[in-house]
Every structure is written in structure tokens, then in C-alpha cells.
Amino acid sequence: FYVQYDATISEEVDSYLSGLEDERMRIQKRAENKGLAQSLNDLLNIVMSAGYEYIARMDADDISELNRFERQIQYFDEHPKVECLGTWAVEIMGDGGEYYRKQMPESHEDCKKLFRKRDCMIHPTVIFRRSYIEKSGLYSLDTYFGEDTMMWAQGFVAGCVFANVPEYLFRFRLDDNFFKRRRGWKHAKGIFTLRHKVNKMLHYGVMADFWALAYAGAKMMPICMLNVIYKTARK
């Protein structure tokens, strides 16, 4: 297990991590916050060099169900061509209360079809085969945000196979500022720029740019409306 944190963290968390007596744990510390994509790439370089076949990641405040890894590895064994595997997830608020049950398509074909409009994977639920990283490369450092979206695009271009386990194996936490961070002109512009680039990479055509424009436009709406759209547009 590799744990990385950038910049400063609370003394309580630092003390907890430092006190872990588990030889499987590797703590990576960095004084400067260089962003999620750089941190993920640093860890990918480490685990790829170590020769691991499967690579999983999650954020500190999310929760994996106890059988998550068992079910995903079993799915890999039953579907040897799959290289990027996610799951369904239950979105929870800061207090742990359920907000939304998020489903994703199971098959590769349906994943690629959905990707014309929006992401087809829930990032922290994903486990990669090492072959995925070997084919697609590391996370892009050239995006304002959406490093996961670009990672999926790189995988599709490289011919990688995607799938999702149709089970709720993960709880994804939404903090109080979740929608506030995902709206505004800068975010809307970044969304359209990213999705337009993805559409060109995958030759999705003009209709996909229409969806990108609609997606970006939603980011300019009031938070109360964005909350409603966030739920209804994904059904």
C-alpha cells in the first residue's frame, strides 16, 4: 500500500500515518503540493517499477467495500482482455448520508458510447492492469483539471479495454464545497476545452461537441440548479 500526501497535513493524521506498524505500508511525503496528476504519476512510476500486475487508487476520504478488490480481481480473471475496471458507487455526503447511487456501463462498447457525453468510469473505483499504463502512458499534466478524463481518452486511443463491475463496491464522498468547486467560467471553459480535445482524439464528431458545450454551460448555473442537473442528467 502506498500513501502519498503533499504539503502539510494535520498533526493527527501525520501522527497516525507515522505510527502505523505495517510493513506493507509505504508513506510518500512531499513538502510542495504539485497536484493530483503529478502525485499519481509519481506513484505509478514506483509501482510499475516494482512489477505489480494490478494498480488501484482511491482518495483518503472515500470508502471501499470489504469485498471490492476481491470482486474486481475476480472480474479480471473472468475477462482477461479487460485492462481498466471500475465499479458502481454510492455517493455520500460529509456526514455519511447517501446522496446518489451512481451506475456506469459494464461493457467496453457501452463505456465508449457514454464517453461521447461524459466520463464512463468513476476514477477512484478503477483498477488498472499494468498493460493499460504500458499502452496509454501516465496521467496528462497539460490539463487544468480532468486528468482522469484524459487518461480514459489515452486508453481508448491506445486500444485498451474498459469495463465496470455492476455492483456498488465503493462509497464516494461529496464534501460541502463539491458543487461550488465545479462551477464558474474557468471551470466551464476548462470542461469544453478538455472535451473538445477528447472528441478530436476519438473522432466523435460535431454532436459530441454539442454535448461538451451543454456540459460546460451547466457549470455556469446556480448551485441549486447544478445540484438538480447533477442527479437527473446521469440517469
Where are these regions (language model features)?
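Nucleotide-sugar donor-binding/catalytic module of glycosyltransferases
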Residues: 1-184
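Non-catalytic, C-terminal membrane-associated alpha-helical segments of glycosyltransferases
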Residues: 178-235
